[in-house]
Amino acid sequence: MTRQHFGTDGIRGTVGQPPITPDFVLRLAHAVGRVLRQTQERPVVLIGKDTRISGYMLESALESGFNSAGVDVVLLGPLPTPGVAYLTCAQRASLGVVISASHNPYPDNGIKFFSAQGSKLSDAWEQAVETALGEPPAWTNSANLGKARRLNDAAERYIEFCKNTFAQDLSLKGLKIVLDAAHGAAYQVGPKVLRELEAEVIAIGCSPDGLNINHEVGATHPDTLVRAVHAHHADYGIALDGDADRVLIVDATGRLYNGDELLYLMVADRMGRDEHVPGVVGTLMTNRAVELALQARGVEFVRAKVGDRYILEELTRRDWALGGEGSGHLLALDRHTTGDGIGSALQVLQACVRSRSTLAQLLAAVTLYPQVLLNVRLPPDQDWTTNRLLADAIQAVEQQLGASGRVLIRASGTEPLLRVMVEARDAQLADSCAQRLANAARAGWQGHTSLKNAPPMGAN
């Protein structure tokens, strides 16, 4: 049976449109509660959220749905996704729920779940919820209704968890760090963690109003951070996204380092301390230069499908700890059960402090191949694999690039977009090929029979 509502990272959409409506979210929570009650007499669910204005409404709907199924609820308030995962495990809750659409703008929102162990839930569990959604509600009698309470020190508990991942004999004293929390879930905890580790912190993107999450700030708009690092003559800049499960870092020169580079640095730091790293999981998008640099160190590299869910599955299957993707989702399963933007940033800063080296020095072995990523809006009910013009263009581009480049075409798991990626040793070639593929996709959907408007192969 196929899943109707769950995507690659829970359920996500535009608020007020199915499935992100109060009535559906209430039914969803009720269905999840019924699944939990099959194995637990009195389940307890933790609910956290980011700073979107719709979070209040959806939080109330979840609370009502869970209580109606006989499930108790603990409200955490605004908290990074990894904080919810941590507290779900630490509080021995039955389930963790996050209300967030991650890096998307405020009109979107979503619901995602964590198991009692703080990890993403299985396809089988999601299918069980889909099945329960298709059945009539089974309202619990009044005597067995659930209750709700707030965990007032949730943020402080997560702050301590983050600090405890940093070496006790090191600190950030003497470092000036700009933190951009994207007006999102880490707007309070992010600056506090860094300050309590003795850094001088300039906080930007830390004034949420319910409508400004991810708006020209955060990991999806790193230029804002780069400008702030220059303006404040900072040593480092840290960019998080709306739910703080991803991170990008800027050095004192304004150079931006993506998740691929930070993943390599984390591996190199561990190996430099004689830790064994048997293998690393990236994605189909991971830069080829990182793969080669890891292999040169004797580290096996495996590509999973795009998305931290699939990285996690592959890491678990192989019993490895480290994985990540260029967007800044980084996994260190011996530190946390899920991607943690603040925790990953601390690992990187710790490596710099311990070695007394800059990011550029630590990443001297990696020179990324130019990559061009374009987004093409997918028309409703269109299967990109049947686009004949795009298929022909892919074949032509792959022949031109040969072994020195890569083409990756995929549908986004969270938005109605086709992702077009071209990687080549030459930046202009990568750009022209990506533009050709994007134009081919658009032309194919518009019913065109040729690519007259596409740039010629190899054009600047």
Curated annotation (Swiss-Prot):
The Swiss-Prot or TrEMBL record lists the needed cofactor(s) as:
Mg(2+)
Q: Which residues carry this modification: Phosphoserine?
A: 102
Which ranges form a coiled coil? none
For this chain, the Swiss-Prot or TrEMBL PTM comment says: Activated by phosphorylation.
> Recorded E.C. number(s)?
5.4.2.10
Binding-site list for Mg(2+): 102, 241, 243, 245
Function, as annotated? Catalyzes the conversion of glucosamine-6-phosphate to glucosamine-1-phosphate.
Entry protein name:
Phosphoglucosamine mutase
Which organism does this sequence originate in? Verminephrobacter eiseniae (strain EF01-2)
Question: What lineage does UniProt assign to this protein's organism?
Answer: Bacteria, Pseudomonadati, Pseudomonadota, Betaproteobacteria, Burkholderiales
